[in-house]
Regions:
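TPR/TPR-like (Sel1-like) alpha-helical repeat modules
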Residues: 144-167, 174, 178-181
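Start-of-helix register in tetratricopeptide repeats
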Residues: 66, 100, 133-134, 168, ...
Length: 186
């Protein structure tokens, strides 16, 4: 199990860094971290099939992941976007199948006015949960900022078509419809 100090080194980890860490664990003489090469191969295979995440390979539990998410959220709320960006990128790397990590990354990039990257991050979140209006709606905001009308309309239409009009979704659906109407008039 990775501890807090070990988690800090993962915040700026690249895929190559993660691979090196996995290799280091595989070659370790320490019985607590020794992992058979066969197990590594199985984990990597599961990773590419989407059956596990890097967090599983690193031994990061839900409490640690939630702690990292809270840290990223607090950085974001405090306007520390560079720190939030590092944290959300690490979270997306560690658990690529968790939509809220991609939403956090998208929101951070959007606040940094990196609209294309933000829209891409929102796109990952939308693919993972197409019934959540937030990723597509915020991607549309990014496309509007980029003056990409076609992609903005597509994102807004996905909000209207794919999202159930639940009390929490309705404000996004109503805003999407209103923006689409404004876009038709221009």
């Amino acid at each position: 199990m990775a501890n807090y100090d070990e988690n800090k080194k993962f915040a700026n980890a690249t895929p190559e860094d993660i691979e090196a860490i996995i290799d280091e664990i595989a070659k370790s003489k320490d019985p607590q971290t020794k992992i058979d090469g066969k197990i590594i191969g199985t984990l990597v295979e599961k990773l590419f099939k989407g059956e596990c995440a890097i967090r599983d390979i690193l031994g990061l539990d839900d409490k640690q992941m939630n702690g990292l998410y809270a840290m990223g959220y607090n950085f974001y709320q405090g306007g520390k976007y560079d720190d939030a960006l590092k944290t959300f990128r690490a979270l997306c790397l560690f658990d690529q199948l968790e939509p809220k990590h991609w939403l956090g990354l998208g929101a951070t990039l959007q606040m940094m006015k990196k609209y294309e990257e933000a829209a891409n991050a929102y796109g990952f979140a939308a693919v993972m949960d197409c019934h959540d209006p937030r990723p597509s709606f915020h991607a549309a905001e990014c496309y509007i900022a980029l003056n990409d009308r076609e992609k903005a309309e597509a994102a807004l239409n996905s909000v209207v078509v794919l999202c159930e009009p639940t009390p929490e979704n309705k404000p996004f659906i109503d805003k999407a419809n209103a923006i689409l109407e404004l876009m038709k008039g221009k």
